[in-house]
């Protein structure tokens, strides 16, 4: 196993917040991830291209770079301190061993506007479909504020559904200010550092607990070698959270539970195949 690094990333923080086991594995298995699939490489490529399109809207912006995280953090602080007004790409912040990078930072006097660029189309931030994007941005803002930067405004840039080939580049993004939604999450994150650090610094992996997200988790078979036998995840449209909490794991466990006709047929088919 690779040596565990001290600094905690956004991905590790958010993963641990949702599932202690996932966060621990993410932190302790750095460098052990399998090679990217073609689909994953393609998503990264598209994300990079979209990020560049966002930067193009700030032709005088400055890219922050360095040989490692610490150098990027130091360069960020120096650049922001010596500039009265400016735009910065890939600025990095660190506070109490938590690190975050921002796609775009605008500095106006003594205040900052953090922008995160997404490669998906616009999401409703008041619903579950948009929550992960707000959580992602809130982490960056939380770390930046802890590092001493006065972040007063935050925005998410999504791909505009109205953009058409040939339109001006300024129409490519749907720009949503989400300062209020982010500000509501920052105090929640303020209560998390001690427990998250304790989890990640523990040499023992936390005991996994089945949750809804296990279905698509990269580590589901590592946590549960018999995961394929947990057939409750194969039932369509099922709100699995309450059933998992009650100890139900298989289609057989769902016999007699309140299900719609489609779910009942799925349960019967799964049981017949066992």
PLM regions: where:
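Accessory alpha-helical DNA-binding modules that contact the DNA backbone or grooves
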Residues: 235-274
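Metal-dependent nuclease catalytic cores that hydrolyze phosphodiester bonds in DNA/RNA
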Residues: 1-111, 240-256
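Polybasic (Lys/Arg-rich)
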Residues: 188-212
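Alpha-helical scaffold elements adjacent to nucleotide-binding pockets in ATP/GTP-utilizing enzyme cores
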Residues: 53, 136-140, 188, 192-195
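Extended, structured, electrostatic nucleic-acid-contact surfaces
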Residues: 215-238
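Short coil/turn segments at secondary-structure boundaries
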Residues: 26-29, 67, 207-217
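Hydrophobic/aromatic-lined pockets within catalytic cores
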Residues: 142-149, 201, 222, 237, ...
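Mg2+/Mn2+-dependent nuclease catalytic core
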Residues: 78-184
């Amino acid at each position: 196993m690779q040596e565990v690094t001290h600094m905690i990333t956004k991905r590790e923080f958010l993963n641990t917040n949702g599932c202690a086991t996932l966060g621990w594995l993410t932190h302790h298995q750095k460098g052990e991830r399998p090679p990217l699939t073609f689909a994953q490489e393609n998503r990264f490529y598209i994300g990079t291209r979209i990020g560049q399109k966002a930067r193009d809207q700030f032709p005088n912006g400055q890219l922050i770079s360095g040989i490692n995280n610490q150098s990027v953090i130091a360069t960020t602080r120096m650049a922001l301190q010596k500039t009265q007004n400016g735009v910065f790409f890939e600025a990095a912040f660190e506070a109490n061993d938590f690190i975050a990078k921002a796609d775009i930072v605008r500095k106006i006097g003594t205040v900052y506007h953090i922008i995160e660029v997404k490669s998906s189309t616009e999401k409703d931030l008041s619903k579950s479909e948009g929550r992960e994007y707000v959580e992602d941005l809130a982490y960056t803002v939380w770390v930046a504020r802890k590092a001493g930067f006065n972040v007063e405004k935050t925005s998410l840039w999504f791909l505009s559904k109205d953009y058409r080939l040939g339109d001006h580049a300024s129409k490519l993004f749907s720009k949503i200010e989400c300062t209020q939604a982010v500000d509501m999450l920052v105090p929640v994150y303020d209560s998390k550092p001690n427990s998250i650090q304790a989890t990640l610094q523990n040499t023992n992996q936390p005991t996994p607990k089945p949750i809804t997200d296990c279905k698509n988790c990269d580590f589901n078979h590592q946590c549960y070698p018999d995961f394929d036998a947990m057939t409750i995840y194969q039932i369509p449209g099922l709100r699995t959270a309450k059933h998992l909490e009650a100890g139900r794991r298989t289609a057989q466990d769902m016999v007699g539970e309140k299900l719609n006709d489609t779910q009942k047929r799925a349960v019967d088919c799964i049981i017949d195949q066992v």
